[in-house]
Amino acid sequence: MKGNQEEYRLKFFLDHDYLRRECKVCKTPFWSKDKTREDCADIPCSDYYFLDMKESNLNWSVSEARRRFLDFFRRNGHEIIPPKPVLARWREDLYLTIASIVDFQPYITSGISPPPANPLVVSQPCIRMDDVDNVGITFGRHLTTFEMGGHHAFNYPDKFLYWKDETVAYAKEFFTKEMGIPEELLNFKESWWEGGGNAGPSFEVTVGGLELATLVFMQYEIRDGEYVPLKLKIVDTGYGIERLAWFTQKTPTAFHAIYGELVDKFLEKLGLPSLNPDMLKVASRFAGRIDPDVPSTIQGHREQVAKAMGLPVKEVSEELTRAARVFQVLDHTKTIALMLGDGLVPSSGGEGYLGRLLIRRALRTLKLLNVDVRLSELVDMQIGFWGKDFTQLVRNRDYILDAVNLEQEKFNEILNRMSSVVSSLTKKKEIGVEDLIQLYDSQGIPPDLMAEEMRSKGLKVEVPHNFYSIVAKRHQSAPVKKEWDTTKLPPEVVKQVKDLPPTEKLYYKDQYARNFEGVIVKSLGKYLVLDRTVFYPEGGGQLGDQGWLLLDGQRVKVVDTQKVGDVVVHVLEREISAKEGDKVKGEIDWVRRFRMMRHHTGTHVVLAAAKKLLGDHVWQAGAEKTPEKARLDITHHRNLTREEVKRIEEMANLVVDDRRPVTPFEINRTEAETKYGVSIYEGGVPNKAVIRLLEIKDWDVESCGGTHVANTADIGGIKIVNVEKIQDGIIRLEYVAGDVISSYAGNLEDKLEGLASKLETSTSQIESRVEKLKEENERMKELIAFYRRQYLDDLEKHVETRNVGKVKIVILPSLKDEDLEREAMRRLTSTQGVVVIHVNQVNGKLQIEIGTSKDLNVSTVVTELVKAGGKGGGRGTFGSVMIEKGTKEEVIDIVERAIKGGNS
């Protein structure tokens, strides 16, 4: 285990004359055939001297590196499997796919489910936001998106495939035979890996300063601080596909190797001059010495580059800053395309928060570059460049670009209100990190764009260099609750039933069953557990069944049904005296249940219709099925139009009319994911090896544990009754099905009758009556406007005024109309040298509003009123003050004194 040298002393190393040495810089042991090597050939112990190596003369693009990697392991007995999306929707605890092993967590790695192949190989696009602030400044060491080439072997006690020696041998074979790297240049640096509750020894494969792969051997579970050997031992490797490309191309930076011609195309689109390749190559060579958490190392790096180039530090610093920002835009736009292409909808929570964060960081970088380019144009260039590798980008192009455009519009609105937000903070002397995070979360304003304006207003503020990384880490994972954390049952009941045998679920054997007989397993007052039941417990957004139980001649109402794990608990309306082993007859409220079955199946139909109409980004964000109606929350970036709602409803009802079979079935989760993809988890991720899917023929397949009709015809029709945006990026659809449509229509008719009565017309004439009332209303508005103008003209002639020097004080009377008072204030202050005061009694206090012409300033008057005991403020030409006690004349006297005492 950790610290045990024998974990790393492999037969392969001994048989192939590798020596175990200790790095003279970091003191980490490593294995190499080079007897003269003194360091581990990894940064910061070594520079990126691979850039000057001549040993490997390949020129792989990222696509070619991926192909070569996959093909090598295919030839060596590994099955190639397709990558999963960058959104980890098969995980409830994680938003983004951060490594290839995530594809198999937690069910395959824990041994609950079999892997899709064994051994296997995958090139998995990954997204990590932990180091987002470091992108660009390390010239390729940090990326938000990268491909992890992973060959994996799952070693079971009865089926052991290969382990450490073979894994290291594969690495040696790949790097020497496929890439042409002399074996003497390979270094296997000893390390230790921990993550997700597992641990194991690992090797980092380094060549010329660049880490090309990590070989992890998951063999322990961390339990109470102890390392407990796992029965399932997993080979978990990560080859950096982009790094393989950079190693072979030896371009000035990793970004040149990854993006090729796109670098110059971006510069052209941004209207920026070409980058200095010689300077960038020197900068990359020394980039390993940069520790972004120590800002002084960045300055030291630039001084080193300047010295090597014989150039002024200022010139080098400006050029490298510009290059880093261009690289940030390159990196972020690809990641944005991948996120949105896999269905992310930018929002203020969950995975959408991370997408919005990256979009806003890209927009902020464009502002810092002082360029006026739509971000969507740059994202579109990424789609064109990567479309063959990631076909979902092309398929979802329209959505991706529309969503990015909408986010840029929102960002511009945010910047427009930045000044007012900063002004509201002037009472604070210092703005801390938590303040900045709160401001970013609530207002969306990038702190580095705010900082300059904050400082100009006397605020002390320091923006952390890793601000976005701090924020991203807080939002990168989701809290996961145990099933019984969300139950409505009392804790003492949960405690007593959670270890009982599973209840036989008759509602799955026959979803149309209404009656049953069972035996009491546990009786806890008004909580009853039976050995079997047709009562469906609340779950998946469907309410628990109600009905009746008959025992000892008593008919007791069941008011709710809940579950704890696989144990179903019947909640009775009153406590009963019953013994374990007693027989019980049960009957569900069938009318109620059947309505929920219709609504539940209808939800699957509506969700699939919305996804087919609006795009792959539509994902279920919540649902509820009650007897009265159903609701479905979906992710979507815009409000739905009336036409879109009508089309979703039409598509759903066509499925109802098609009389499609609705079939529930059980399947191994690995097989289900392979066959149907992770979209089966729209309604949540079940915690089982074998999962229950619901298939609506040729329409939808989704994991679901609810009760459903047997044929879409049984839904009886679907009517969408309400659509609203409930939060940023979430649209709620409410609808009714079957006989509830008739009730809904009846309620509408009652409302129409009531409306007709109020309008003194018939229901058939409501529309024409409303049109007539609208016309009358417009005429009244015109008439009122005419009388307002006349009144104001007359007011200007007769309003009370007082002169103080060259300033005229106008005392505006109460007009009992706020709009009229505002218009009067505007007109009266339109000429120079005017101060208007309006005094109103509000709950025994004096509410004073002051307006001045543009040549005067309201602050002097406001200051005097505050000195006199008032509370309020003002700036420019308007102020407002509240005084507890006083008279109108006293207020006028204060205003006169203020004007006499100085310019108002």
Curated annotation (Swiss-Prot):
Enzyme Commission (EC) number: 6.1.1.7
Residues at which Zn(2+) binds: H600, H604, C704, H708
Swiss-Prot/TrEMBL catalytic activity: tRNA(Ala) + L-alanine + ATP = L-alanyl-tRNA(Ala) + AMP + diphosphate
Keywords annotated in UniProt: Aminoacyl-tRNA synthetase, ATP-binding, Cytoplasm, Ligase, Metal-binding, Nucleotide-binding, Protein biosynthesis, RNA-binding, tRNA-binding, Zinc
Cofactor, how bound (note): Binds 1 zinc ion per subunit.
Gene3D superfamilies in UniProt: 2.40.30.130, 3.30.54.20, Bira Bifunctional Protein, Domain 2, Threonyl-trna Synthetase, Chain A, domain 2
Listed CDD domains: AlaRS_core
Protein's GO biological process: alanyl-tRNA aminoacylation
Main localisation: cytoplasm
PANTHER family the UniProt entry points to: ALANINE--TRNA LIGASE, CYTOPLASMIC, ALANYL-TRNA SYNTHETASE
Purpose: Catalyzes the attachment of alanine to tRNA(Ala) in a two-step reaction: alanine is first activated by ATP to form Ala-AMP and then transferred to the acceptor end of tRNA(Ala). Also edits incorrectly charged Ser-tRNA(Ala) and Gly-tRNA(Ala) via its editing domain.
Family annotation (NCBIfam families): A-tRNA_syn_arch, alaS
Name of the protein this chain belongs to: Alanine--tRNA ligase
Source organism: Metallosphaera sedula (strain ATCC 51363 / DSM 5348 / JCM 9185 / NBRC 15509 / TH2)
Gene name per UniProt: alaS
